[in-house]
Amino acid sequence: VMCDAQHKMSKRNGDPSYEDLIREGYLTEAVLNYVALLGWSPKGENAEREFFTLQELAEIFDISGISKSPAVFDLDKLRWMNAEYMKKLSPEAFFAKAEPVLKTVITNPAIDLKAVAALVQPRCEILSDLPERVDFIDRLPEYSTELYVHKKSKTTLENSLSSLREILPVLESLEVWTNEGLYEALVALAAKLELKNSVVLWPLRVAVSGKASTPGGATELCALLGKE
């Protein structure tokens, strides 16, 4: 197995072992599935499949499917495959794996960790990515106001500040503090101000997270953080 077209994988060169991958938050099932397809391809009706259980691999393995050429270990492909396995986990199974990681960065007892897990699961590639994705929940990070400038959302520093000033009293008076209730109120505000929804929602998303990339949208984050 090669790390690139010229070099074999080697622990000495910093290439990951199975144990390293598991510590990083890859799932055993994903690693086994990926490694099984390195230098070997299934035949017949399974030729186009990419996902197999260990039992299925044992049943369909045929030595004739082994390639004579060296296989290249593509970590990006493994990340993609692991993300697909993450999505397939039941909410309970994902939470069991994610909870220990989430507890290292979220210490506020008022935060529902199961709700956090449900929000991040569809976007989680490996478990070790989670701390960076959710660290804003405990403490808003320092961030550049340039995050409010977003071409696709049509936001500028000026209209973002204006939107936030309009948003605050709406949130303060909102009684139904759910994702749906928040979204309905903010979309109504955008319509009242004759603005695109994004001109209201993007500034709020930045204001509550301090990040350009978050595990959910503005209303999902607000619902998670709670009104207080």
Annotate each predicted stretch with a short phrase:
Residues 30, 77, 94, 112-119, ...:
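Residue-level detector of well-ordered alpha-helical segments, enriched
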Residues 91-193:
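Small-residue-rich helix-loop
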Residues 4-7, 59-66, 105, 124, ...:
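Short, mixed-charge aromatic SLiMs
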Residues 1-88, 93, 100, 202-213:
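Alpha-helical recognition segments enriched in aromatics with Gly/Pro capping
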Residues 2, 152-155, 225:
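Alpha-helical hairpin
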Residues 180-228:
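Charged substrate- and nucleic-acid-binding regions of tRNA-handling and nucleotidyl-transfer enzymes
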Residues 23, 70, 112, 193-197, ...:
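Secondary-structure capping and boundary motifs in well-ordered enzyme cores
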